[in-house]
UniProtKB/Swiss-Prot annotation:
GO terms for cellular component: mitochondrial inner membrane; respiratory chain complex III. Its main location: mitochondrion. The keyword Metal-binding applies. One of its GO terms (molecular function) is ubiquinol-cytochrome-c reductase activity. This is Cytochrome b. It holds the Pfam family Cytochrome_B. PANTHER family: CYTOCHROME B (PTHR19271:SF16). It comes from Euroscaptor micrura (Himalayan mole). It is a multi-pass membrane protein. GO terms for biological process: mitochondrial electron transport, ubiquinol to cytochrome c. Its cofactor is heme b. The lineage of its organism: Eukaryota, Metazoa, Chordata, Craniata, Vertebrata. Heme b b566 binds at residues 97, 196. Keywords: Electron transport, Heme, Iron, Membrane, Metal-binding, Mitochondrion, Mitochondrion inner membrane, Respiratory chain, Transmembrane, Transmembrane helix, Transport, Ubiquinone.
Protein backbone atom coordinates (compact mmCIF):
# COMPACT_ATOMS: atom_id res chain seq x y z
CA UNK A 1 0.00 0.00 0.00
CA UNK A 2 1.30 3.47 -0.95
CA UNK A 3 1.89 5.96 1.83
CA UNK A 4 -1.16 8.21 2.43
CA UNK A 5 0.96 11.34 2.20
CA UNK A 6 1.72 10.47 -1.44
CA UNK A 7 -1.86 9.67 -2.46
CA UNK A 8 -4.23 11.93 -0.48
CA UNK A 9 -5.07 15.02 -2.62
CA UNK A 10 -4.21 17.53 0.14
CA UNK A 11 -1.34 15.61 1.77
CA UNK A 12 0.20 15.14 -1.67
CA UNK A 13 0.57 18.92 -2.12
CA UNK A 14 2.17 19.29 1.32
CA UNK A 15 4.40 16.28 0.65
CA UNK A 16 5.64 17.66 -2.67
CA UNK A 17 6.24 21.10 -1.15
CA UNK A 18 7.84 20.34 2.23
CA UNK A 19 8.78 16.66 2.49
CA UNK A 20 9.83 14.93 -0.74
CA UNK A 21 10.80 18.19 -2.45
CA UNK A 22 14.17 17.79 -4.23
CA UNK A 23 16.41 20.62 -2.96
CA UNK A 24 19.98 21.66 -3.86
CA UNK A 25 22.52 20.14 -1.47
CA UNK A 26 24.46 23.38 -1.00
CA UNK A 27 21.90 26.07 -0.09
CA UNK A 28 23.17 28.12 2.86
CA UNK A 29 21.41 29.83 5.77
CA UNK A 30 20.54 32.70 3.41
CA UNK A 31 17.83 30.35 2.08
CA UNK A 32 16.20 30.17 5.54
CA UNK A 33 14.33 33.47 5.24
CA UNK A 34 11.44 32.14 3.14
CA UNK A 35 10.32 29.86 5.98
CA UNK A 36 11.03 32.60 8.55
CA UNK A 37 8.77 34.98 6.61
CA UNK A 38 6.04 32.32 6.68
CA UNK A 39 6.42 32.06 10.46
CA UNK A 40 6.35 35.87 10.79
CA UNK A 41 3.16 36.08 8.72
CA UNK A 42 1.49 33.35 10.79
CA UNK A 43 2.52 35.11 14.02
CA UNK A 44 1.23 38.47 12.75
CA UNK A 45 -2.13 37.01 11.68
CA UNK A 46 -2.60 35.23 15.03
CA UNK A 47 -1.54 38.14 17.27
CA UNK A 48 -3.47 40.54 15.02
CA UNK A 49 -6.61 38.44 15.35
CA UNK A 50 -6.43 38.55 19.15
CA UNK A 51 -5.75 42.31 19.10
CA UNK A 52 -8.75 42.85 16.80
CA UNK A 53 -10.96 41.18 19.42
CA UNK A 54 -10.30 44.11 21.79
CA UNK A 55 -9.51 47.00 19.42
CA UNK A 56 -12.09 49.61 18.36
CA UNK A 57 -11.53 51.50 15.10
CA UNK A 58 -13.10 54.77 16.22
CA UNK A 59 -11.12 58.01 16.65
CA UNK A 60 -12.55 58.61 20.12
CA UNK A 61 -11.77 55.14 21.51
CA UNK A 62 -8.90 53.68 19.38
CA UNK A 63 -6.07 55.00 21.61
CA UNK A 64 -7.95 53.98 24.78
CA UNK A 65 -8.64 50.50 23.41
CA UNK A 66 -4.90 49.94 22.81
CA UNK A 67 -4.19 51.15 26.37
CA UNK A 68 -6.94 48.77 27.59
CA UNK A 69 -5.28 45.87 25.70
CA UNK A 70 -1.93 46.60 27.39
CA UNK A 71 -3.32 47.14 30.90
CA UNK A 72 -6.43 44.98 31.31
CA UNK A 73 -6.39 42.12 28.80
CA UNK A 74 -4.65 38.90 29.92
CA UNK A 75 -1.18 39.03 28.35
CA UNK A 76 -2.49 41.86 26.15
CA UNK A 77 0.84 43.71 26.51
CA UNK A 78 2.62 40.59 25.21
CA UNK A 79 0.27 40.17 22.23
CA UNK A 80 0.55 43.88 21.36
CA UNK A 81 4.36 43.97 21.55
CA UNK A 82 4.71 40.65 19.71
CA UNK A 83 2.60 42.17 16.93
CA UNK A 84 4.52 45.49 16.83
CA UNK A 85 7.99 43.94 17.03
CA UNK A 86 6.90 40.99 14.88
CA UNK A 87 6.49 43.55 12.10
CA UNK A 88 10.12 44.60 12.61
CA UNK A 89 11.28 40.98 12.44
CA UNK A 90 9.13 40.55 9.32
CA UNK A 91 10.94 43.43 7.61
CA UNK A 92 14.40 42.29 8.76
CA UNK A 93 13.67 38.88 7.18
CA UNK A 94 12.20 40.56 4.08
CA UNK A 95 15.25 42.77 3.51
CA UNK A 96 17.64 39.84 4.02
CA UNK A 97 15.50 37.65 1.72
CA UNK A 98 15.54 40.30 -1.04
CA UNK A 99 19.27 40.93 -0.46
CA UNK A 100 19.95 37.20 -0.87
CA UNK A 101 17.95 37.25 -4.13
CA UNK A 102 20.00 40.18 -5.45
CA UNK A 103 23.36 38.67 -4.44
CA UNK A 104 22.77 35.18 -5.82
CA UNK A 105 20.80 36.18 -8.93
CA UNK A 106 17.53 34.59 -7.77
CA UNK A 107 15.71 37.31 -9.74
CA UNK A 108 16.34 35.25 -12.88
CA UNK A 109 13.24 33.28 -11.85
CA UNK A 110 11.08 36.07 -13.28
CA UNK A 111 7.61 34.92 -12.12
CA UNK A 112 8.75 34.14 -8.56
CA UNK A 113 10.65 37.45 -8.37
CA UNK A 114 7.76 39.59 -9.67
CA UNK A 115 5.30 38.01 -7.23
CA UNK A 116 7.91 38.75 -4.55
CA UNK A 117 8.00 42.45 -5.53
CA UNK A 118 4.17 42.56 -5.33
CA UNK A 119 4.40 40.86 -1.92
CA UNK A 120 6.90 43.51 -0.74
CA UNK A 121 4.50 46.31 -1.75
CA UNK A 122 1.59 44.51 -0.05
CA UNK A 123 3.53 44.04 3.21
CA UNK A 124 4.64 47.70 3.18
CA UNK A 125 1.02 48.84 2.64
CA UNK A 126 -0.16 46.59 5.48
CA UNK A 127 2.53 47.83 7.88
CA UNK A 128 1.77 51.47 7.05
CA UNK A 129 -1.95 51.03 7.74
CA UNK A 130 -1.24 49.09 10.92
CA UNK A 131 0.91 51.96 12.22
CA UNK A 132 -2.11 54.30 11.89
CA UNK A 133 -4.41 52.14 14.05
CA UNK A 134 -3.18 53.02 17.62
CA UNK A 135 -4.15 56.63 16.77
CA UNK A 136 -1.16 58.25 18.44
CA UNK A 137 0.50 61.45 17.21
CA UNK A 138 2.84 59.68 14.79
CA UNK A 139 -0.04 57.47 13.57
CA UNK A 140 -2.16 60.49 12.67
CA UNK A 141 0.56 62.66 11.18
CA UNK A 142 2.20 59.74 9.37
CA UNK A 143 -1.16 58.93 7.76
CA UNK A 144 -1.68 62.60 6.87
CA UNK A 145 1.77 63.06 5.31
CA UNK A 146 1.92 59.78 3.36
CA UNK A 147 -1.65 59.86 2.00
CA UNK A 148 -1.11 63.52 1.07
CA UNK A 149 1.67 62.41 -1.31
CA UNK A 150 -1.03 61.19 -3.71
CA UNK A 151 -2.10 64.81 -4.20
CA UNK A 152 1.07 65.17 -6.30
CA UNK A 153 -0.62 63.12 -9.05
CA UNK A 154 -1.64 65.65 -11.73
CA UNK A 155 -5.34 66.48 -12.22
CA UNK A 156 -6.87 63.69 -10.06
CA UNK A 157 -4.52 63.98 -7.04
CA UNK A 158 -6.67 66.07 -4.67
CA UNK A 159 -9.86 64.12 -5.42
CA UNK A 160 -7.97 60.86 -4.92
CA UNK A 161 -6.65 61.91 -1.50
CA UNK A 162 -10.10 63.03 -0.30
CA UNK A 163 -11.57 59.77 -1.60
CA UNK A 164 -9.01 57.74 0.40
CA UNK A 165 -9.59 59.92 3.49
CA UNK A 166 -13.38 59.64 3.19
CA UNK A 167 -13.58 63.37 3.98
CA UNK A 168 -11.47 66.52 3.99
CA UNK A 169 -8.90 65.26 6.49
CA UNK A 170 -7.67 62.06 8.15
CA UNK A 171 -10.59 61.23 10.44
CA UNK A 172 -12.97 58.49 11.65
CA UNK A 173 -13.72 57.22 8.12
CA UNK A 174 -9.98 56.92 7.37
CA UNK A 175 -9.27 54.97 10.56
CA UNK A 176 -12.17 52.56 9.97
CA UNK A 177 -11.19 51.76 6.39
CA UNK A 178 -7.50 51.42 7.32
CA UNK A 179 -8.51 48.85 9.96
CA UNK A 180 -10.58 46.95 7.38
CA UNK A 181 -7.71 46.92 4.87
CA UNK A 182 -5.14 46.09 7.55
CA UNK A 183 -7.25 43.06 8.52
CA UNK A 184 -7.80 41.70 4.98
CA UNK A 185 -4.35 42.31 3.44
CA UNK A 186 -2.41 39.66 5.44
CA UNK A 187 -4.75 36.98 4.04
CA UNK A 188 -4.13 38.30 0.52
CA UNK A 189 -0.39 38.20 1.34
CA UNK A 190 -0.74 34.56 2.46
CA UNK A 191 -2.46 33.69 -0.84
CA UNK A 192 0.25 35.53 -2.82
CA UNK A 193 2.93 33.68 -0.81
CA UNK A 194 1.28 30.43 -1.97
CA UNK A 195 1.55 31.61 -5.59
CA UNK A 196 5.17 32.68 -4.89
CA UNK A 197 5.92 29.13 -3.71
CA UNK A 198 4.01 27.60 -6.64
CA UNK A 199 6.19 29.48 -9.15
CA UNK A 200 9.36 28.64 -7.19
CA UNK A 201 8.55 24.91 -7.30
CA UNK A 202 8.15 25.11 -11.09
CA UNK A 203 11.90 25.80 -11.37
CA UNK A 204 13.32 24.60 -8.06
CA UNK A 205 15.55 26.65 -5.77
CA UNK A 206 18.60 28.59 -6.87
CA UNK A 207 21.84 27.93 -4.95
CA UNK A 208 24.93 29.97 -3.95
CA UNK A 209 26.96 28.97 -7.02
CA UNK A 210 24.20 30.00 -9.43
CA UNK A 211 24.82 26.76 -11.36
CA UNK A 212 22.26 24.03 -12.07
CA UNK A 213 21.86 21.69 -9.10
CA UNK A 214 19.91 18.98 -10.97
CA UNK A 215 22.84 16.57 -10.63
CA UNK A 216 22.92 16.80 -6.83
CA UNK A 217 19.56 17.04 -5.08
CA UNK A 218 18.58 15.98 -1.55
CA UNK A 219 15.08 15.62 -0.01
CA UNK A 220 13.79 18.69 1.82
CA UNK A 221 12.90 16.55 4.85
CA UNK A 222 14.80 15.94 7.14
CA UNK A 223 17.74 18.07 5.95
CA UNK A 224 16.09 21.45 5.44
CA UNK A 225 13.19 20.96 7.87
CA UNK A 226 15.68 20.69 10.75
CA UNK A 227 17.66 23.62 9.34
CA UNK A 228 14.48 25.74 9.12
CA UNK A 229 13.56 24.80 12.71
CA UNK A 230 16.99 26.00 13.89
CA UNK A 231 16.53 29.28 11.99
CA UNK A 232 13.05 29.68 13.48
CA UNK A 233 14.39 29.13 17.02
CA UNK A 234 17.08 31.78 16.51
CA UNK A 235 14.48 34.26 15.20
CA UNK A 236 12.01 33.50 18.01
CA UNK A 237 14.83 33.99 20.54
CA UNK A 238 15.73 37.38 19.00
CA UNK A 239 12.06 38.45 18.94
CA UNK A 240 11.54 37.28 22.54
CA UNK A 241 14.55 39.29 23.75
CA UNK A 242 13.25 42.37 21.91
CA UNK A 243 9.67 42.00 23.19
CA UNK A 244 10.52 41.11 26.79
CA UNK A 245 13.48 43.42 27.43
CA UNK A 246 13.05 46.50 25.20
CA UNK A 247 9.64 46.42 23.51
CA UNK A 248 9.70 50.16 22.70
CA UNK A 249 13.23 50.21 21.29
CA UNK A 250 12.09 50.48 17.66
CA UNK A 251 8.93 52.53 18.27
CA UNK A 252 8.42 56.30 18.43
CA UNK A 253 7.71 57.87 21.86
CA UNK A 254 5.36 60.37 20.12
CA UNK A 255 2.94 57.52 19.49
CA UNK A 256 2.20 57.40 23.23
CA UNK A 257 0.60 60.85 22.85
CA UNK A 258 -3.02 60.62 21.58
CA UNK A 259 -3.54 62.01 18.05
CA UNK A 260 -4.04 65.78 18.00
CA UNK A 261 -4.79 67.41 14.62
CA UNK A 262 -3.97 70.85 16.11
CA UNK A 263 -0.43 69.97 17.19
CA UNK A 264 2.17 68.84 14.64
CA UNK A 265 5.12 66.82 16.05
CA UNK A 266 8.54 68.46 15.40
CA UNK A 267 9.83 65.47 13.40
CA UNK A 268 7.35 63.33 11.48
CA UNK A 269 8.97 60.03 10.58
CA UNK A 270 7.74 56.51 9.79
CA UNK A 271 8.84 53.25 11.43
CA UNK A 272 12.53 52.33 10.93
CA UNK A 273 11.85 49.93 8.03
CA UNK A 274 10.49 52.76 5.83
CA UNK A 275 13.21 55.29 6.62
CA UNK A 276 15.39 54.49 3.56
CA UNK A 277 12.45 55.19 1.21
CA UNK A 278 11.43 58.25 3.27
CA UNK A 279 14.98 59.64 2.92
CA UNK A 280 14.80 59.22 -0.88
CA UNK A 281 11.39 60.95 -0.89
CA UNK A 282 12.71 63.92 1.14
CA UNK A 283 15.93 64.29 -0.84
CA UNK A 284 14.06 65.63 -3.90
CA UNK A 285 12.78 69.20 -3.42
CA UNK A 286 9.82 68.62 -5.79
CA UNK A 287 6.66 66.87 -4.52
CA UNK A 288 5.86 64.81 -7.64
CA UNK A 289 9.57 64.03 -8.21
CA UNK A 290 9.89 62.82 -4.62
CA UNK A 291 6.83 60.57 -4.91
CA UNK A 292 8.13 59.08 -8.19
CA UNK A 293 11.57 58.46 -6.62
CA UNK A 294 9.89 56.85 -3.60
CA UNK A 295 7.83 54.44 -5.74
CA UNK A 296 10.70 53.74 -8.12
CA UNK A 297 13.10 53.00 -5.23
CA UNK A 298 11.11 49.78 -4.64
CA UNK A 299 9.79 49.22 -8.17
CA UNK A 300 13.40 49.21 -9.44
CA UNK A 301 13.59 45.64 -8.07
CA UNK A 302 11.28 44.53 -10.90
CA UNK A 303 13.94 45.73 -13.38
CA UNK A 304 16.70 43.57 -11.88
CA UNK A 305 16.35 40.69 -14.43
CA UNK A 306 16.64 43.25 -17.27
CA UNK A 307 19.71 44.89 -15.71
CA UNK A 308 21.56 41.57 -15.37
CA UNK A 309 24.44 41.80 -17.87
CA UNK A 310 26.75 39.16 -16.38
CA UNK A 311 27.25 35.74 -17.94
CA UNK A 312 27.25 34.27 -14.46
CA UNK A 313 24.09 34.17 -12.37
CA UNK A 314 25.46 34.50 -8.85
CA UNK A 315 27.90 37.08 -7.44
CA UNK A 316 29.82 34.28 -5.73
CA UNK A 317 32.69 34.45 -8.25
CA UNK A 318 32.40 38.17 -9.12
CA UNK A 319 34.48 40.29 -6.70
CA UNK A 320 33.80 43.68 -8.37
CA UNK A 321 30.04 43.14 -8.25
CA UNK A 322 30.40 41.97 -4.64
CA UNK A 323 32.06 45.26 -3.68
CA UNK A 324 29.27 47.23 -5.35
CA UNK A 325 26.62 45.06 -3.67
CA UNK A 326 28.04 45.77 -0.21
CA UNK A 327 28.35 49.44 -1.13
CA UNK A 328 24.61 49.33 -1.91
CA UNK A 329 23.95 47.77 1.53
CA UNK A 330 26.03 50.52 3.21
CA UNK A 331 24.16 53.13 1.14
CA UNK A 332 20.77 51.76 2.28
CA UNK A 333 21.94 51.86 5.92
CA UNK A 334 23.03 55.49 5.37
CA UNK A 335 19.61 56.32 3.89
CA UNK A 336 17.91 54.65 6.88
CA UNK A 337 19.96 56.83 9.25
CA UNK A 338 19.23 60.00 7.23
CA UNK A 339 15.49 59.26 7.14
CA UNK A 340 15.39 59.55 10.93
CA UNK A 341 17.29 62.87 11.03
CA UNK A 342 15.80 66.39 10.83
CA UNK A 343 15.83 68.19 7.45
CA UNK A 344 18.89 70.40 8.00
CA UNK A 345 22.55 70.68 7.04
CA UNK A 346 24.51 68.34 6.66
CA UNK A 347 21.75 65.68 6.51
CA UNK A 348 20.10 67.14 3.39
CA UNK A 349 23.20 66.83 1.20
CA UNK A 350 24.13 63.40 2.63
CA UNK A 351 20.60 62.16 1.83
CA UNK A 352 20.76 63.55 -1.71
CA UNK A 353 24.15 61.96 -2.40
CA UNK A 354 23.03 58.63 -0.92
CA UNK A 355 19.85 58.72 -3.07
CA UNK A 356 21.84 59.43 -6.25
CA UNK A 357 24.29 56.64 -5.36
CA UNK A 358 21.39 54.20 -4.75
CA UNK A 359 19.97 54.64 -8.26
CA UNK A 360 23.42 54.93 -9.89
CA UNK A 361 24.58 51.64 -8.35
CA UNK A 362 21.56 49.66 -9.53
CA UNK A 363 21.00 51.26 -12.94
CA UNK A 364 24.56 52.04 -14.06
CA UNK A 365 27.47 50.81 -11.93
CA UNK A 366 26.42 47.19 -11.29
CA UNK A 367 25.51 46.40 -14.94
CA UNK A 368 28.82 48.01 -16.05
CA UNK A 369 30.79 46.01 -13.46
CA UNK A 370 29.16 42.81 -14.77
CA UNK A 371 30.20 43.63 -18.35
CA UNK A 372 33.72 44.39 -17.13
CA UNK A 373 33.90 41.03 -15.32
CA UNK A 374 32.75 39.25 -18.50
CA UNK A 375 35.67 40.83 -20.37
CA UNK A 376 38.17 40.11 -17.60
CA UNK A 377 37.17 36.43 -17.76
CA UNK A 378 37.28 36.59 -21.61
CA UNK A 379 33.66 35.42 -21.81
Amino acid sequence: MTNIRKTHPLMKIINNSFIDLPAPSNISSWWNFGSLLGICLTLQILTGLFLAMHYTSDTTTAFSSVTHICRDVNYGWLIRYLHANGASMFFICLFLHVGRGLYYGSYMFMETWNIGVILLFAVMATAFMGYVLPWGQMSFWGATVITNLLSAIPYIGTDLVEWIWGGFSVDKATLTRFFAFHFILPFIIAALAGVHLLFLHETGSNNPSGLSSDTDKIPFHPYYTIKDILGALVMILALSILVLFSPDLLGDPDNYIPANPLNTPPHIKPEWYFLFAYAILRSIPNKLGGVLALVFSILILALMPLLHTSKQRSMMFRPISQCLFWLLVADLLTLTWIGGQPVEHPFIIIGQLASILYFALILILMPLASLMENNLLKW
